[in-house]
């Protein structure tokens, strides 16, 4: 079983602003979010299939607790409440499908994958736009 535990720092990010745009975030808030999310602090604690993930930026901190295979509530990247279900796609990759609790919006999901090089790759998807963020352990 892969070990996602640790404190992670971002080394690369692609398409984050484009993702926020497709989610309908206005231009001013996008600029603030992109600046704040340029240096997130990510803490992951893992015990088997149970995860705690805390992501902190200068603008907001999010925390999620989940067990792979069990539905839980969280927020989409733009802050809308949703139900999420995480499954293992492969030995080192988890996939999360999100469903909005109310209202309409783009179909959203995320994945987290550990590479053989020790990088953590987070992808966030809204409809056809994919944002990729790459982290290394601190």
UniProtKB/Swiss-Prot annotation:
GO BP terms in the entry: embryonic forelimb morphogenesis; epidermis development; fatty acid transport; positive regulation of collateral sprouting; regulation of DNA-templated transcription; retinoic acid metabolic process; signal transduction
Xref: InterPro entries: Calycin, Fatty_acid-bd, ILBP, Lipocln_cytosolic_FA-bd_dom
A GO MF term: retinoic acid binding
Covalent link location (Glycyl lysine isopeptide (Lys-Gly) (interchain with G-Cter in SUMO)): 102
Domain of life of the native organism: Eukaryota
CDD domains found in the cross-reference section: CRABP2 (cd19461)
Membrane-spanning parts: none
One Gene Ontology cellular component annotation held by this UniProt entry: cytoplasm
PROSITE patterns with a match to the protein in the record: FABP (PS00214)
Statement: the UniProt record of this protein carries the keyword Ribonucleoprotein: no
Changes after translation: Sumoylated in response to retinoic acid binding, sumoylation is critical for dissociation from ER and subsequent nuclear translocation.
Keywords: Cytoplasm, Endoplasmic reticulum, Isopeptide bond, Nucleus, Retinol-binding, Transport, Ubl conjugation, Vitamin A
Record has Protein biosynthesis as a keyword: no
Effect seen on changing residue 30 to A: Loss of ligand-induced nuclear import
Biological role: Transports retinoic acid to the nucleus. Regulates the access of retinoic acid to the nuclear retinoic acid receptors.
Subunit structure: Interacts with RXR and RARA. Interacts with importin alpha.
Family label: Belongs to the calycin superfamily. Fatty-acid binding protein (FABP) family.
UniProt name for this protein: Cellular retinoic acid-binding protein 2
